[in-house]
Regions:
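Short secondary-structure boundary motifs at beta->alpha junctions and helix caps
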Residues: 88-95, 164-205
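Extracytoplasmic/secreted envelope proteins and their assembly/folding machinery
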Residues: 62, 101, 105-109, 115, ...
Length: 238
């Protein structure tokens, strides 16, 4: 015969086992935890600046684009926001799908190709040889909450270099601020994409104009009289 005390112990043991199983299910069920949201960054708007560029020609320079890099603090997947000057913070559950520098690289190439100012635009690493080289750096990409509405600020510095002479032909710093439609990570992401698109258009226009005044080193030496032009002799005609 089973005593009432034994029945009570069995019931308590069964209840304890059930609680343990429920606890284990809770640990394994990760759907209850807030998962991070991942966002992308696209900068090229095809057709936006093609009207400003000269038709593509075989004599146009080939442009080599080095992979963009970013200033410290802006070289990760984290989406940065600022509430106080000089203090960078990041959203806990919102991230870029890749680093901003890697995400904007295809957009830079697309925007430059759209100008038709270059014979070809090539992203390194590549075995292709180029006449000009473009180096870019992201100085900041941050969601700023210091005023209402909040806004995203994107700053990019670019150098256009003559590959043969290693001379900097032109450089410029591009700074864009776009208001966010909402004070939330997604609002900042939308504003960031618009800011990057604006900078890509300005960057492409800058490079196209600089390429328009570029001349190969040999051509410059011909004009300066350092080398004879075709059909001329270096000997004294007298």
């Amino acid at each position: 015969m089973i005593s009432p005390s034994n029945n009570c112990l069995r019931r308590l043991g069964g209840a304890g086992l059930l609680l343990l199983l429920l606890g284990a299910c809770g640990i394994l069920d990760t759907t209850r935890e807030a998962r991070p949201a991942f966002y992308s960054l696209y900068g090229a708007r095809p057709g936006a600046i093609s009207s400003i560029a000269a038709p593509r020609s075989i004599s146009a320079p080939t442009l080599i684009v080095n992979p963009p890099h970013a200033a410290p603090g802006f070289d990760s997947h984290r989406i940065i926001y600022v509430r106080e000057p000089h203090q960078l913070e990041y959203f806990a559950r919102s991230e870029w799908i890749d680093t901003p520098a890697r995400m904007i690289a295809p957009s830079i190439v697309a925007a430059l190709e759209n100008t038709s100012a270059f014979r070809a635009v090539v992203m390194t690493p590549s075995v292709a040889a180029g006449d000009l080289r473009l180096d870019v750096e992201i100085l900041r990409l941050q969601h700023e909450f210091g005023s209402a509405p909040s806004h995203v600020r994107f700053t990019l510095r670019a150098y256009l270099v003559d590959n043969e002479t290693r001379q900097v032909l032109a450089w410029q710093e591009f700074d864009e601020t776009v208001a966010a439609e909402q004070d939330a990570p997604y609002g900042g992401v939308v504003a960031a994409n618009r800011a990057v698109q604006n900078v890509m258009e300005r960057l492409a226009s800058f490079c196209a104009k600089a390429a328009g005044i570029w001349a190969p080193a040999d051509s410059k030496r011909h004009k300066a009289g350092e080398l004879p032009l075709s059909g001329q002799s270096m000997a004294n005609p007298n």
